[in-house]
């Protein structure tokens, strides 16, 4: 029920990764990357489908060998989400996956061989309308840049990126996006800020090798949040040493917290204290697990007492305020007569939330129809 995000996004050009528009005001896309062996087609397809099930809009797949390229061909046939092929060094792999219908090539033109090889890949991308992602990483900077700067710096990452950008510019190719990732938040943020001033192309955001599920989520939220709050970024990936499904969940949570994109339920819940009249933590955890399938954006407040409960409920689509034995229920910011028994909250609140989500979804369909 809060107003739209006050963030003014950086202007950028538009590319399309399959059917997903990137840049020029398009919704910020959330993507992930498989961590299976690409040659294990069944496992890779299964993981891609699980990523898509929680909202993944683009999936990157590593294609290190020709054998993996042949597996990619079969994977592409079995999924509908746009796929990005991650390729290093061998330009022939890029040509092969282009033949097999790849939606985007993640390559660095400067490391796939001489200019003729680069030209062959770019000409193929032009012919098949395939965008390219230039991906610079603080852990793999060119040796001369390491010597020049002594260590990875924002300037070093951007100089590396601009080398690849210049190659594409010389070949009259502008359908690309760029990332300048690092595992250090300040290094990555500084590099993206510099790059945003130098080019108009879309920027793919990420804090690379961020860490395990908890620490990586925090680091990504801080780094990506800083950039997104400044209007920088057109697509995001949260890199976690965890199930890629978790990357999508965290990515959408970051966008949701900045009111950039809303997907699913935004739970507003107190950390609980001795004033709580029901088990707030247990209730919220249970509902989060049960309601992961709901995609309709909505705010649900679950507060254990009457100190902050009514205030939060008044700005929520549904709100629960703790009271002795029977807790108060709010809908659209207004108190309703019905009260819910504290000893049976989860089942009843789940039913209320699902019903509200269905009504909101129907209202959204009607509004879109009227606009059309």
UniProtKB/Swiss-Prot annotation:
The enzyme's main class, written as a single word, is oxidoreductase
GO terms (BP aspect):
isopentenyl diphosphate biosynthetic process, methylerythritol 4-phosphate pathway; terpenoid biosynthetic process
Q: Name one GO molecular function term.
A: 4-hydroxy-3-methylbut-2-enyl-diphosphate synthase activity (flavodoxin)
Q: Which UniProt keywords apply?
A: 4Fe-4S, Iron, Iron-sulfur, Isoprene biosynthesis, Metal-binding, Oxidoreductase
Quick one: which pathway? Isoprenoid biosynthesis; isopentenyl diphosphate biosynthesis via DXP pathway; isopentenyl diphosphate from 1-deoxy-D-xylulose 5-phosphate: step 5/6
> What is the reaction catalyzed?
(2E)-4-hydroxy-3-methylbut-2-enyl diphosphate + oxidized [flavodoxin] + H2O + 2 H(+) = 2-C-methyl-D-erythritol 2,4-cyclic diphosphate + reduced [flavodoxin]
* Cofactors named for this entry: [4Fe-4S] cluster
Q: Where does [4Fe-4S] cluster bind?
A: 270, 273, 305, 312
Q: Where are the transmembrane segments?
A: none
Q: Which Pfam families match?
A: GcpE
The free-text note explaining how the cofactor binds reads:
Binds 1 [4Fe-4S] cluster.
Q: Which InterPro entries match?
A: Dihydropteroate_synth-like_sf, Enolase-like_C_sf, IspG_bac, IspG_bac-typ, NO2/SO3_Rdtase_4Fe4S_sf
Q: Which family does it belong to?
A: Belongs to the IspG family.
Q: Which PANTHER family match?
A: 4-HYDROXY-3-METHYLBUT-2-EN-1-YL DIPHOSPHATE SYNTHASE (PTHR30454), 4-HYDROXY-3-METHYLBUT-2-EN-1-YL DIPHOSPHATE SYNTHASE (FERREDOXIN), CHLOROPLASTIC (PTHR30454:SF0)
Q: What does this protein do?
A: Converts 2C-methyl-D-erythritol 2,4-cyclodiphosphate (ME-2,4cPP) into 1-hydroxy-2-methyl-2-(E)-butenyl 4-diphosphate.
Q: What is this protein called?
A: 4-hydroxy-3-methylbut-2-en-1-yl diphosphate synthase (flavodoxin)
Q: Which organism is it from?
A: Alteromonas mediterranea (strain DSM 17117 / CIP 110805 / LMG 28347 / Deep ecotype)
Gene (UniProt)? ispG
